[in-house]
């Protein structure tokens, strides 16, 4: 049941994430009223390949929405809109007549398109489409994943060209199903998700015909690109139709953009970093498309209705929270993720050990898919506690590399970093981050800023909140860490970290 002080109405948000789907109901102050969450299976058919079963995910989404509404003790009349945020780049093709996926979804971490990306960049290199899309050619993005499916699923290209197949990232799949599926479901995506396909032109905010043709993706299967905060349709049909029919589906943002929005980084130069499976840092660059020369991505931050789009610079780190999971599940060095803080705190420093978790190559600012993980600086002195500390430091050093790149590209020094995501409950990590960045690190009251961002955008779309100033007024600081490290120590350790990073590169030989 809802707390007495949280009288309705409410906004709900679906977060279709990498490891789970959840739904959170928020009140007008941006406070959490109820949460429901369900994990889905991670499918690893081959090394470097990662898939999800999209039908399982849609079933889970329906369950968590119903679950969150039930836990809140509310009905459809109390909910003004529902918003969506999602794992980005994860790619799905489905049959528009049956609603059945033609293959498992290819997840953002999946590297099977490496060779295809090399092929696409053959004469011109990684930056072939960067000017238009803001992205380097990398296995991370959705366009090449769609092409891989078209090339590898029998008869699929013909069906796609005939208009029987729909392409979507997870936002598109969820919206299509929520709004009726085979019975008139809306086939749309928002500008933030579209900006991660490598098929959208940042300057026109539309699909780029030339690039789609070069990558080999038929325009017929692409969704319509819409803003991040507008009513796309309403909940219709199926289990949720009975329960919540008629509620407007009113926002979509890729998870990292949603966190930027939820952290109320509405001014140029404001930045947030989300610490989850991977880590993603975004800096608002206003209406300027800043091309990065330091290995960052240029992406759409958000677009509210018919207002001008707001752009962002992004640095992505593939492995952070998942490194802690690896320590727990594969190495058995800890029993729970929370235990790593206790273990790492039992020593003063890393004992000279550095851990670079390039499990699926290095993301920003290097973009080296030939890199693999390395633990460097090992001696007999090093214990599992030192390794635990090196694991946490890896996240902090990788963040430092990204803030350096952002300053270089944008000319804006980082004044403070707003943080969110599961790993921010680790106080040792947050202090280390502040030490390595030499800047304050601030955590808000509501750590679920991804869902909050989707709720905020949906609420703006239906007039539940009037403007971004209303949203800023909701932001509350829960904790702040300030630097407490001598400059010479910081510089010396950063040099060692960079040496360890060099050791990871060139491990995988080109399979020519």
Curated annotation (Swiss-Prot):
User: What InterPro entries does this protein's entry cite?
Assistant: ATPase_NBD (IPR043129), Carb_kinase_FGGY (IPR000577), Carb_kinase_FGGY_CS (IPR018483), FGGY_C (IPR018485), FGGY_N (IPR018484), Glycerol_kin (IPR005999)
Where is ATP annotated to bind?
A: 18-20, 277, 321, 325, 422
Give the EC class as a word.
transferase
What domain of life is recorded for the organism?
Bacteria
Named in its record, the pathway it takes part in is: Polyol metabolism; glycerol degradation via glycerol kinase pathway; sn-glycerol 3-phosphate from glycerol: step 1/1
Q: Does the keyword Kinase apply?
A: yes
Q: Write down the NCBIfam families for this protein, in alphabetical order.
A: glycerol_kin, PRK00047.1
PANTHER family, alphabetically?
Answer: GLYCEROL KINASE (PTHR10196:SF69), SUGAR KINASE (PTHR10196)
Q: Which family does it belong to?
A: Belongs to the FGGY kinase family.
Q: What is this protein called?
A: Glycerol kinase 1
Q: Which organism is it from?
A: Streptomyces avermitilis (strain ATCC 31267 / DSM 46492 / JCM 5070 / NBRC 14893 / NCIMB 12804 / NRRL 8165 / MA-4680)
The beginning of the lineage is:
Bacteria, Bacillati, Actinomycetota, Actinomycetes, Kitasatosporales
């Amino acid at each position: 049941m809802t707390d007495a002080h949280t009288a309705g109405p409410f906004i709900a948000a679906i977060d279709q994430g990498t490891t789970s789907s959840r739904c959170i109901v928020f009140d007008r102050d941006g406070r959490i009223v109820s949460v429901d969450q369900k994990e889905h299976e991670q499918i690893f058919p081959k090394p470097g390949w990662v898939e999800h079963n999209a039908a399982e995910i849609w079933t889970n989404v329906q369950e968590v929405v119903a679950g969150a509404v039930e836990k809140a003790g509310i009905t459809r009349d109390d909910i003004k809109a529902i918003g969506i945020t999602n794992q980005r780049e994860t790619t799905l093709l489905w049959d528009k007549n049956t609603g059945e996926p033609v293959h498992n979804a290819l997840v953002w971490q999946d590297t099977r398109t490496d060779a295809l990306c090399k092929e696409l960049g053959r004469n011109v290199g990684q930056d072939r489409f960067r000017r238009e899309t803001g992205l380097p050619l990398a296995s991370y993005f959705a366009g090449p994943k769609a092409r891989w499916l078209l090339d590898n699923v029998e008869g699929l290209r013909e069906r796609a060209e005939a208009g029987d197949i729909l392409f979507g990232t997870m936002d598109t799949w969820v919206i299509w199903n929520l709004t009726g599926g085979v019975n008139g479901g809306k086939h749309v995506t928002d500008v933030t998700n579209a900006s991660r396909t490598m098929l959208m032109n940042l300057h026109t905010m539309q699909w780029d015909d030339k690039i789609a043709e070069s990558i080999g993706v038929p325009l017929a299967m692409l969704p319509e690109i819409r803003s991040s905060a507008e009513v796309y349709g309403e909940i219709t049909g199926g289990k949720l139709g009975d329960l919540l029919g008629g509620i407007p589906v009113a926002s979509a943002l890729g998870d990292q953009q949603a966190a930027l929005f939820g952290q109320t980084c509405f001014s140029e130069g404001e930045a947030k970093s989300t610490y989850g499976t991977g880590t993603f840092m975004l800096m608002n660059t206003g209406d300027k498309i800043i091309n990065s020369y330091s290995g960052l991505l240029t992406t759409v931050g958000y677009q509210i209705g018919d207002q001008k789009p707001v752009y962002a610079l992004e640095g992505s780190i593939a492995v952070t929270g998942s490194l802690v999971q690896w320590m727990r599940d594969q190495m058995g060095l800890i029993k729970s993720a929370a235990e790593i803080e206790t273990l790492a705190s039992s020593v003063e420093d890393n004992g000279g050990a550095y851990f670079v978790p390039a499990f699926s190559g290095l993301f920003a600012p290097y973009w080296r898919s030939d890199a693999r993980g390395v633990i460097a600086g090992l001696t007999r002195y090093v214990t599992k506690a030192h390794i635990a500390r090196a694991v946490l430091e890896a996240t902090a050093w990788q963040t430092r590399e990204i803030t350096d790149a952002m300053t270089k590209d944008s000319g804006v020094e980082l004044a403070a970093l707003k943080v969110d995501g599961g790993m921010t409950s680790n106080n040792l990590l947050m202090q280390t981050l502040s030490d390595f960045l030499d800047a304050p690190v601030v955590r808000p009251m509501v750590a679920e800023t991804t869902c909050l961002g989707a709720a905020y955008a949906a609420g703006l779309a239906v007039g539940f909140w009037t403007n971004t100033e209303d949203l800023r007024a909701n932001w509350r600081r829960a904790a702040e860490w300030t630097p407490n490290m001598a400059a010479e120590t910081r510089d010396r350790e950063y040099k060692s970290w960079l040496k360890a990073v060099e050791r990871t590169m060139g491990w995988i030989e080109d399979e020519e």
